[in-house]
A protein has these predicted regions:
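Acidic, small-polar-rich N-terminal luminal/periplasmic segments of exported/outer-membrane proteins
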Residues: 29-166, 504
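Gram-negative outer-membrane beta-barrel transporters
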Residues: 375-376, 423, 523-525, 545-660
Length: 731
């Protein structure tokens, strides 16, 4: 017995071909089937009535050659966007425009990240380095039945390579610009007749390369030192029991996000003369250091008892560290002898220390060898604690403690009505409880329980095409935001948000299995949607509920194996998001240097100070790109005992509003980046080896990724152009 169970009805069709590996495909002159675990069992994508994109192979590994982190996946999957204002530690995920732009380490997210079947709830845990990955699956839309709360937008699933009986190994070394040196290696195989193991390591290093012109220091910031290791042991004590134990560890030291003061001119969203990628002007922040470590352990046990299989997944995660940064992005202030670049109302530097613990337990049962009905049911328990100590510099540090406990019961079934029609239905009940403990008796306790589910109908039009329709619901648990306590304010609370969505999809394979198309259209409404009001006039971090919101969009994935030498992919996503709350207002930029385009009014804050409010009814969601485009081309030509190859990838991000309110400055338009790698690989003999040259951000685009609006027109940018070479071996 092997787990997870593979569906007997799997059709040799793969969808989301945009993101499949190319090298192995050319040799067969057809596109290989893609297997996913989107429904907690192995299935062909053709059997799954969900909009799913997958990524693996060269398409995946090429993104990380310049020392990139998980944000490199952003816009490379249609409908997926990732950004961070906290360096490599706290990525924020968005799917179909839905996410959370709150930078606070306690903020909940509507996109769930799952690594090797273990949910990573906190943003620090979501940042574990991505290496030795078999595939990535992006599940778009609510996944409330099988995965529960906080999946209203979707899920990003990472599946590591697992141990096999065959002895295998691989190693890859990248050397590039700015002193970039990356190494990734893995080895595994059979240890005894019923025990297998695999261990993988990663190191990513980059030198300081950014000058601090205020202090006169050259190469003062930008360093990366990241080390990670993970391993698995697979054990089969009997013929009907499988055990898989995993452990991982990560150690990070380096530079956090760099905020650049007044690089946006009032009335314009183009970078101005204050911006120089290789220069900052910091008088605080001590070089914006960031240090974190993370360890985790998980145990999966599968027991085949004949007609049924019982599965248990137990996991523990722990992480701690700190980030310190110059938030105003410049030096001095208007009331000090000097300031710059541009207008600095007041200095701001903050350090956050975090200690994260998480425990999860899942028990489920499913039937085996079902002729017409496959079902699974289970229970899930989640318990997490987070302590955040914030030092704003002008008052004593404050520690705020968060705890979150959740229970769930779930079930889902696939009923094969005929050879062509399949009905899928799922339901889940969830209880979610959150507590906050803060100084001066500012304690808060909130809880909620919800029922979510899905119903879909799939029709196989032929052996190579299908259509489906799906309705689904989900919810994000209530939220507590306690960051303002550290700045003399009070905590805020938001009720649970609930989503209802409908989507229709089409999947097809044609041209003798050399082309694949995956398309979906959808519409969703979110009641009591949670938004984070970050910064602005008054410099607060508050969670709020809007009455309602909605979005409509589409996704398209296409892959075409032109011939044995050329493989092309294309991805496209469009989403139109809208906030629907006629009375909802938020504070605009604190510096008054930005240009709001929303209706505004002058009011008073909690301290009686004048503040400019904007009505955000009808606005798009923050950090929700209206369009994303991606394109790749792979070329291979056999020579001698191997082949020469070239691979290029490009992505474009359309109009994106950074904050809840709209301005002329804090929005991005038609940003794009591309990469290229070319070389020679030998694929005959006892082992394969490869040598290549690569370039990331080949045109050296200077793109805004986000902003800080409470002080001045501050922004942070993308990664620089990185060029280099790599050598790898695999056996």
């Amino acid at each position: 017995m092997k787990f997870p169970i593979r569906a007997k009805t799997a059709i040799a069709l793969a969808i989301s071909g945009t993101l499949a590996t190319g090298a192995s495909l050319a040799s067969a002159q057809v596109l290989e089937e893609v297997i996913v675990t989107a429904q907690k069992r192995e299935q062909s994508l053709m059997d799954v009535p969900i909009s799913i994109a997958t990524m693996s192979g060269e398409r995946f590994t090429s993104l990380f050659e310049g020392g990139a982190d998980v944000r490199a996946l952003s816009t490379r999957v249609p409908g997926l966007y990732i950004e961070s204002s906290n360096g490599r530690v706290a990525p924020r995920f968005y799917i179909r425009g839905l996410g959370n732009s709150d930078f606070d380490l306690a903020a909940s997210q509507p996109v769930s990240v799952i690594m090797d079947e273990v949910v990573k709830e906190n943003v620090v845990l979501k940042s574990f380095p991505i290496f030795d990955i078999d595939r990535v699956e992006v599940l778009r839309g609510p996944q409330g039945s099988l995965f529960g709360r906080n999946t209203t937008a979707g899920i990003v699933k990472f599946e590591s390579f697992k141990p096999t009986e065959e002895f295998t190994g691989r190693a890859k070394l990248d050397v590039g610009d700015y002193g970039t040196v990356n190494f990734e290696g893995a080895v595994g195989g059979g240890i005894t007749d019923n025990l297998q193991g695999r261990v993988a390591v990663l190191t990513q290093n980059r030198d300081d390369w950014i000058d601090n012109d205020y202090t006169g220091e050259s190469d003062a910031l930008g360093e990366i030192e990241e080390k990670a290791i993970k391993g698995f042991l697979a054990w089969q004590p009997t013929d009907n029991i499988d055990v898989l134990f995993g452990a991982h560890y990560r150690d990070l030291e380096g530079t956090s996000s760099l905020f650049r003061a007044n690089v946006l001119t009032t009335g314009d969203n183009d970078l101005n003369e204050n911006y120089d990628r290789e220069t900052v002007y910091f008088d605080e922040g001590d070089g914006n250091p960031q240090e974190y470590d993370n360890d985790g352990y998980n145990l999966k046990v599968g027991w085949d008892i004949g007609a049924y299989t019982l599965t248990s997944i137990t996991a523990y995660e722990n992480a701690n560290g700190y980030s310190f940064g110059d938030i105003d992005g410049g030096f001095g202030a208007v009331f000090l002898p000097e300031m710059g670049p541009g207008f600095i109302p007041f200095p701001s530097a903050t350090q956050d220390d975090a200690d994260v613990e998480q425990f999860t337990q899942e028990l489920r049962i499913n039937n085996n060898d079902a002729e017409r009905l496959f079902w699974q049911a289970g229970v899930f328990y989640f318990d997490a604690d987070l302590d955040v100590k914030t030092d704003p510099g002008f008052t004593d540090p404050t520690t705020v403690s968060h705890s979150n406990e959740s229970w769930a019961v779930f079930g889902q079934g696939d009923y094969y009505l005929t050879d062509q029609w399949t009905l899928t239905a799922g339901i889940r009940w969830t209880y979610d409880d959150k507590e906050l403990d803060a100084p001066a008796g500012q304690s808060t306790d909130i809880d909620d329980d919800q029922v979510s589910g899905n119903l879909s109908l799939a029709y196989n039009m032929s052996d190579n095409s299908m259509v489906w329709g799906k309705i689904a619901s989900g919810f994000r648990g209530p939220s507590i935001q306690g960051r303002d306590v550290a700045f003399g304010g009070v905590s805020s609370v938001a009720d649970s948000e609930t989503i209802n969505s409908i989507e229709f999809g089409y999947k097809a394979e044609f041209l003798d299995n050399r082309a694949r198309l995956n398309a979906a259209v959808y519409y969703y409404e979110v009641d009591d949607i949670q938004f984070s009001v970050v910064g602005g006039d008054g410099n607060s971090v508050t969670v709020i509920n809007a009455d309602s919101s909605n979005a409509a969009g589409m996704e398209l994935d296409l892959q075409f194996l032109v011939n044995e030498y050329v493989d092309l992919t294309f991805g496209y996503a469009y989403v139109d998001t809208e906030i629907d709350d006629s009375n909802l207002e938020v504070a605009t930029c604190g510096s008054r240097l930005c240009t709001p385009t929303d209706p505004t009014r002058l009011g008073l804050d909690q301290f009686g100070q004048p503040i400019l409010f904007a009505n955000i009814d009808g606005n798009p969601f923050p950090q929700a790109p209206e369009t994303t485009l991606s394109f790749t081309a792979s070329f291979r030509y056999p020579v001698s005992r191997g082949e020469i190859f070239a691979f290029t990838d490009w992505a474009m991000q359309g109009d994106t509003n950074i904050f809840l309110y709209e301005t002329k400055e804090y929005k991005t338009e038609d940003q794009f980046e591309g990469g290229l790698r070319a070389g020679y690989r030998q694929t005959s003999g006892d082992y394969d080896w490869e040598v290549a040259a690569f370039v990331r951000n080949i045109t050296d685009e200077e793109n805004i990724q986000g902003g800080v609006d409470f002080n001045n027109n501050t922004a942070f940018d993308n990664e620089p152009r990185i060029w280099g070479g790599s050598v790898s071996v695999e056996f």
